[in-house]
């Protein structure tokens, strides 16, 4: 408290001394000490100047900043306040902090990119902008921003806040960068209305803007209001920079011309509308007319032209002849137009049997059937001749022919089926497959290249024709050229293009009919090479039963041995089953067959590929299962192929009695073979197979290379002495096979050769003794087993 009183006393003395005009004043040092004391005690806050010779209080710094702002007219152009810092002569950080503090408390000031601006300056700037706007009629925000050196966004904000207050104008709604006066907008609107009202033909807006100097964005903004308010009569068409104004008077003249032409002629060309300035004539007519008009590729037709075409078609169908509708159509019509017009006309009920050729020719079904008459006698004559001279031809019918002939239907049935298929295709809207309309049952649209490539539209018929020509396995009747030659002689009045397409359409039905005749001839002559169904069924049942029993024994071996046993079973017994079934189906479908014992995998695959699709798919899977590592897939596919719809074999299920019978028969067969076998390797193979069947009650079908694994498995069942005999014989057999495999190696002379001969002789003697022991062991084992069973 004493310190404070002392400070107050010193301050009073200091003040008194300053007010007195005495010659005795405080020295500079004393003043500095006093101020420093006040600063240290926190009673006084000062800011040092950059040279350190002066002090400023924060309040004084704020007053000097505002004074400088006032001196500069309300705006101080600064670069990060550096200039202001140099004038006031204090550190820049103090200036920045004080300016920020001023801005927080004084909302009339703003800091924009280093410029400190007050509200009065903005008001004066707005008045200046308004004066410029009233003089020019329009100003751009970007230009104002450049003039006043302020950001565009800030300038736009200032202008918007003072519109209709200090700035008498309007911002463009489409482009906020432009400022207009109301009078300027009114003048421009009046000019635009006058220009557009005087236009009598379509004119691009870009031409109008460039010719009369309109501001583009204002123009598009105003023109929309004028059109929507009906101040100008017209419409726009096009997009972006190519948009045009079409006056109503021009549109009305166009519509009148189109209506008059259509009424007089019954059709209107799209090209004629293009010449009138209508860019999309087809869409224009669709919007214009909503009746029974037909829109063709190049023109629109009305009921008058349709009636002419209908009359010509009805006359041809009722009289059983043909007609080309091109002469009945107006001159500008193209083959494309005629084709599409026929599609529409043939949708009428009662015309489903019509045929279309060359895109414009309609023929009745009666006419087409009459054209087939000359070929009936030729079919029977050719079938008898081919059956006598070339019977191999009948064994190589194509897959499609087999599928259609399997049902045994005649030519009329096949025509009806094909007609129904084409009706479905036509009703789905497709143009392929020879259909020309929703009800066009058998129409063909194949065309020559010179007729604008209409031939390509009949994909199905062209494909069939190409297949018939390129497939050497298909039983052929006549080529298209031969059919055309017969028709040319029988119908000399037919045009060549029409005749060729008619021949192309008739080629497939005539080939089918001939194959049916050929099949009848083949069936009548009989096929003695085909095996009976009962015989094949018996063989398949026997092989299948053995395969199932062999498969059971595979599970008794380790996994690596199971793979070898499964593959051996698939390549032998299962392959024999597959060959029998493939041969049976091939014979049923009139394919060339061979002895199943001589069928190779390549031959079997070729036969399968010639089968119909519904048979080929399951047979292919069955054939593929023969190369698997396990048998499950084969037995699954076997059940499908042997079942209904394919081989239709009655497979008998295995029971205990049947299994015992097969086991006894196999044991007896192996015993008999063992008694007469002299070859050591085969003797050992038969012996271990019999031992395996005896001890496991399972049938074994194994390759020779699996004998060591079988011998190893038998160690658990035979006595050590018996197992020793088996191992010794196995070793001798391996040694003999190894030595016989190296017979071609050059022999060495002298004692070495004699030693080898002695060893070989010793091995042969041991093998002979071992084989006798094995045979005795196995055969006596069977006798002992028989006694035990009895």
From Swiss-Prot:
Residues 412-424 have a biased composition (Basic and acidic residues). PANTHER family: E3 UFM1-PROTEIN LIGASE 1. Transmembrane segments: none annotated. Belongs to the UFL1 family. One of its GO terms (biological process) is reticulophagy. The lineage of its organism: Eukaryota, Metazoa, Cnidaria, Anthozoa, Hexacorallia. Residues 404-478, 741-762 are annotated as: Disordered. Keywords: Transferase, Ubl conjugation pathway. It comes from the Eukaryota. Its EC number is 2.3.2.-. GO terms for molecular function: UFM1 ligase activity; UFM1 transferase activity. Pfam families: E3_UFM1_ligase (PF09743), UFL1 (PF23659), UFL1_C (PF25041). Residues 429-439 have a biased composition (Gly residues). E3 UFM1-protein ligase that mediates ufmylation of target proteins. It comes from Nematostella vectensis. Residues 743-754 have a biased composition (Acidic residues). This is E3 UFM1-protein ligase 1 homolog. GO terms for cellular component: endoplasmic reticulum membrane.
